[in-house]
A protein has these predicted regions:
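Short acidic-hydrophobic, aromatic-tinged amphipathic segments that line or gate anion-handling sites
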Residues: 98-101
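Short beta-strand/loop segment at the start of cytosolic alpha/beta domains
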Residues: 1-15
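Amphipathic alpha-helical interaction surfaces in cytosolic regulatory modules
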Residues: 22-32, 36-96
Length: 101
């Protein structure tokens, strides 16, 4: 799993490349902790190159979302594939934050 991070116009654009699984969930948590220390209005995750996410990975996204909201910031996901979109909708994540294909 790789992270590409870019700050632009108050937004934090984060591209994740590779599967988010149990093996790298701790790395994801650490990356998210670092992101929270950056100044931004909205975190935008591009998941175009993420084939799948395990429940551990989803849990890390939820913790990050909770922290982002508590700081008065926003979060959104874009570039999600059809399988992940169905998964996110089935657990109602689309009701927490915007998800775009």
């Amino acid at each position: 799993m790789e992270f590409n991070i870019e700050q632009r116009n108050g937004n934090l654009n984060i591209s994740i490349i590779g599967a988010v699984d149990n093996e790298n969930a701790e790395e994801l948590k650490n990356q998210f902790q670092e992101l929270l220390n950056l100044g931004f209005k909205e975190a935008v995750f591009d998941l175009s190159f993420v084939p799948f996410i395990t429940s551990s990975g989803i849990g890390k996204f939820l913790i990050f979302y909770k922290n982002v909201i508590s700081q008065g910031k926003k979060m959104r996901i874009k570039g999600i594939n059809e399988n992940l979109l169905e998964l996110f909708k089935s657990i109602k994540l689309d009701q927490l934050f915007p998800i775009e294909k």
